């Protein structure tokens, strides 16, 4: 408002254009909110996105790119400590939250993500045990990662986390002493995840437009499973298959996931062939000394040929979960 006082209430054309722009921003946002409310019922094929809260990021995916975040971050998280989140931090946080949402209400579960993919995940009786077994999944990739828990982070867990360099820690709650420990690293970002509903629609740019779809909220359960082999999976194998399937759902395709005793043993991610993803997973499991005997395998798509199952069998895999659909399934 300084230009009013500085000019005795007079305005320039540029001043009025700026104020008009801000006024129409408010009114158009209000109109969009009304339309989107009614369109929940009528589902007209019209997209109206209006976000008032825009934040300038340090840069985009790379330093030479501009970056912005439009949304109400403070509604989803309470930031306790640390530096400003970067464009890449936000992508990892988004991936972490969506993955851990699959384990909401489960026993203590901890995940470590890097470049939007889980490199470690485990469910245990305590959060400390879950963290340590998640870290064991790939301690190399965990460096600089994003950590997330489905329950309170206590002092014992915080002491273990504090030995690792990580960018972000996310949990629904913390012991105060645990926060004090984690704050010892001045740049580490500590977030409390608030109890809010996650978006139910995904949007991404494509060519000169956007693609919109309903969020994939389907999680495999025992009722979804259909055994198509003579051998029937044990109760323990079924638990591991469902566990691996949740991770597989949130990993870049082509992907193969190995799990055993509710621990991510290894994964092959983002490969151009399913065989390559499988070989990568076997190599990683071997490098971190996992015994795959009795482990299970999840695939994010069907197997067009029997080679993956044959290779997995030789590696010790005893049960496989995959969506099916290959013409060679029979």
Give residue spans per PLM region.
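Internal, active-site/partner-interface "lid" segment
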Residues: 1-40
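ATP-dependent carboxylate/acyl-activation modules
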Residues: 29-32, 36-330
């Amino acid at each position: 408002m300084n230009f009013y006082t500085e000019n005795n209430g007079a305005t320039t054309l540029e001043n009025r254009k700026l104020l008009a722009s801000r006024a129409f921003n408010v009114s158009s946002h209000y109109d969009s909110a009304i339309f989107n409310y009614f369109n929940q019922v009528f589902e007209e094929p019209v997209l109206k996105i209006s976000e008032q809260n825009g934040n300038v990021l340090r840069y985009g995916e790379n330093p030479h790119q501009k970056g912005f975040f439009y949304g109400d971050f403070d509604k989803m998280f309470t930031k306790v400590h640390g530096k400003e989140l970067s464009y890449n931090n936000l992508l990892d946080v988004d991936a972490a939250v969506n993955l851990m949402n699959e384990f909401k209400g489960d026993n203590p579960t901890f995940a470590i993500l890097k470049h939007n993919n889980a490199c470690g995940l485990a469910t245990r009786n305590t959060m400390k045990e879950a963290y340590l077994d998640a870290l064991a999944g790939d301690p190399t990739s965990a460096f600089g990662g994003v950590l997330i828990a489905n329950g309170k982070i206590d002092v014992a867990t915080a002491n273990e986390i504090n030995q690792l360099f990580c960018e972000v820690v996310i949990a629904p709650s913390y012991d105060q002493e645990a926060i004090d420990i984690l704050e010892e690293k001045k740049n580490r970002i500590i977030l409390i995840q608030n109890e809010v509903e996650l978006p139910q629609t995904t949007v991404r740019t494509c060519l000169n437009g956007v693609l919109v779809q309903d969020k994939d909220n389907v999680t495999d359960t025992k009722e979804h499973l259909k055994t198509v082999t003579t051998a029937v999976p044990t109760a323990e194998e079924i638990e591991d298959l469902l566990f691996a399937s949740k991770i597989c759902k949130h990993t870049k395709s082509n992907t193969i996931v190995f799990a055993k005793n509710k621990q991510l043993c290894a994964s092959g991610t983002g490969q151009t062939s399913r065989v390559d993803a499988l070989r990568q997973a076997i190599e990683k499991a071997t490098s971190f000394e996992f015994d795959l005997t009795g482990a299970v395998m999840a695939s994010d798509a069907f197997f067009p040929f029997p080679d993956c199952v044959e290779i997995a069998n030789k590696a010790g895999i005893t049960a496989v979960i995959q969506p099916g659909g290959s013409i060679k399934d029979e």
